[in-house]
Amino acid sequence: MSKRGRGGSSGAKFRISLGLPVGAVINCADNTGAKNLYIISVKGIKGRLNRLPAAGVGDMVMATVKKGKPELRKKVHPAVVIRQRKSYRRKDGVFLYFEDNAGVIVNNKGEMKGSAITGPVAKECADLWPRIASNAGSIA
């Protein structure tokens, strides 16, 4: 798989259950000052008639800030999903899910805007985005 599509990422992206359609509101798990993120599109999704684009762990999305610092609101930011409530299957056969849906604000290259992440980061996301993995407190 080409690395060009996911700027700044490394490793192979495996198929996981997509639990966050366009319109989902997720927690912002970094220290940028944003409280939540509203997903408006998913990067790399071509789509099909009447099907909402959906994101899963490790996907880059375009999002707006609904609650948070005024300088972050009313703008479109790229973000990466780091946790999802919808269970997904790992290659070793274990099913995994988190207690919340969360993401972090990044730039187009995949470098974090903030400098800290609250809560665990999914291993699938950490493998794809090295800059997020370096700021993660714990990787689950």
Swiss-Prot record:
Matching Pfam families: Ribosomal_L14
The keyword Ribonucleoprotein is annotated on this UniProt entry: yes
SUPFAM superfamilies hit by this protein: Ribosomal protein L14
Any GO BP annotation: protein stabilization
Phosphotyrosine: residues bearing it: 38
Location in or out of the cell: Cytoplasm
GO cellular component terms attached to this protein's record: cytoplasm; cytosol; cytosolic large ribosomal subunit; cytosolic ribosome; extracellular exosome; focal adhesion; membrane; nucleolus
A GO MF label: transcription coactivator binding
CDD domains assigned to the protein according to its UniProt record, in alphabetical order: Ribosomal_uL14
Superkingdom in the source lineage: Eukaryota
Gene3D superfamilies xref list: Ribosomal protein L14
Modified residues (Phosphoserine): 17
SMART domains recorded: Ribosomal_L14
Entry-linked PROSITE patterns: RIBOSOMAL_L14 (PS00049)
InterPro entries: Ribosomal_uL14 (IPR000218), Ribosomal_uL14_CS (IPR019972), Ribosomal_uL14_sf (IPR036853)
Family stated for the protein in its record: Belongs to the universal ribosomal protein uL14 family.
Complex and partners: Component of the large ribosomal subunit.
HAMAP family xref list: Ribosomal_uL14
Role of this protein: Component of the large ribosomal subunit. The ribosome is a large ribonucleoprotein complex responsible for the synthesis of proteins in the cell.
Name the record gives this protein: Large ribosomal subunit protein uL14
Gene encoding the protein: RPL23
